[in-house]
Amino acid sequence: MATILTVDDSPSIRQMIKVVLEPAGHNVIEAGDRAQGLAKAQAGKLDLVITDLNMHVMNGLELIRALRKLPSAVGMPIVFLTTESNDTVKQEAKSAGATGWITKPFKPEQLLAVVGKLVRA
């Protein structure tokens, strides 16, 4: 079982992620913005972060850069779950420290497959 933080300003997206991942045995922690996400990342050990790119307060690129400064986030996979599919934005995300990318709308089996590959240890 992995502990997964999902950071998205959309409660329905966070709920959808939870509905897909919890039955597979994962513990899903939710955050609605960058500040909540950072606080929850600092509060406990995480196996994976799934974040949106476009959020109201601060975008996902800034969140990834902040997470990558935390000693606890070294080597931790971070996946973007976003409507963006632009190659330039994907390269920016990779440079910031993103491990993977899933485009919304997503299929539950796609999310499970990506999570399964990244949290296997």
Model regions and ranges:
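Active-site residues of response regulator receiver
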Residues: 52, 82
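Receiver (REC) domain active-site loop signature in two-component systems and cognate sites
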Residues: 55
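Charged docking surfaces used in two-component/phosphorelay signaling
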Residues: 15-23
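Short hydrophobic/Thr-rich beta-strand motif most characteristic of the beta2 strand and flanking loop
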Residues: 25-32, 40, 102
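C-terminal output helix
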Residues: 106-115
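Active-site beta3 strand of CheY-like receiver
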Residues: 45-50
